[in-house]
């Protein structure tokens, strides 16, 4: 993927931020993986493979609502800085009345957009599909590990409903 490639480029013209309901935010984050590497390549691979998709899914044309692809988040900083940047960018998408679509990286990526949603909405529901619950308090000395992300999300039970399937 190049910096100027966008989601479903093969099926549409580039949409403006203002005219797009859906905002793709690529987050090539890979800091706490414990088994294999490669999660940082996920967003680029998804965007590149989207060129093989058809815009019509048999029911609707999501492109009619507009899809805007942001430049990938710079994930070279420390965990706290990167997550703050992801949360800030997600919050700005919510503030525009748009729907963020976050393409990650490892599971830790989920934390920041969920925090942005919790600040924007009264109650947030999270449906978590994974082979693991990701509810550890910490892993390898990090409370922001991919294995801890759902625990961090669920700590504020007043505003988060978490359903997990693993």
Give short role names for the model-derived ranges.
Residues 2-164:
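Conserved alpha-helical scaffold segments that buttress catalytic/binding sites
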């Amino acid at each position: 993927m190049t910096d100027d490639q966008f989601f479903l480029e093969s099926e549409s013209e580039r949409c403006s931020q203002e005219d797009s309901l859906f905002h793709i935010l690529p987050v090539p984050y890979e800091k706490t993986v414990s088994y294999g590497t490669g999660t940082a390549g996920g967003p680029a691979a998804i965007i590149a493979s989207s060129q093989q998709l058809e815009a019509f899914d048999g029911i609707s044309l999501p492109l009619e609502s507009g899809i805007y692809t942001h430049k990938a988040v710079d994930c070279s900083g420390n965990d706290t800085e990167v997550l703050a940047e992801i949360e800030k960018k997600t919050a700005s998408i919510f503030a525009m009345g748009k729907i963020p679509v976050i393409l990650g990286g490892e599971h830790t990526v989920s934390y920041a957009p969920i925090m942005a949603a919790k600040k924007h909405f009264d109650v947030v529901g999270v449906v978590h599909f994974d082979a693991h619950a990701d509810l550890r308090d910490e892993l390898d000395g990090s409370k922001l590990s991919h294995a801890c992300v759902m625990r961090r999300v669920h700590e504020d039970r007043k505003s988060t409903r978490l359903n997990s399937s693993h």
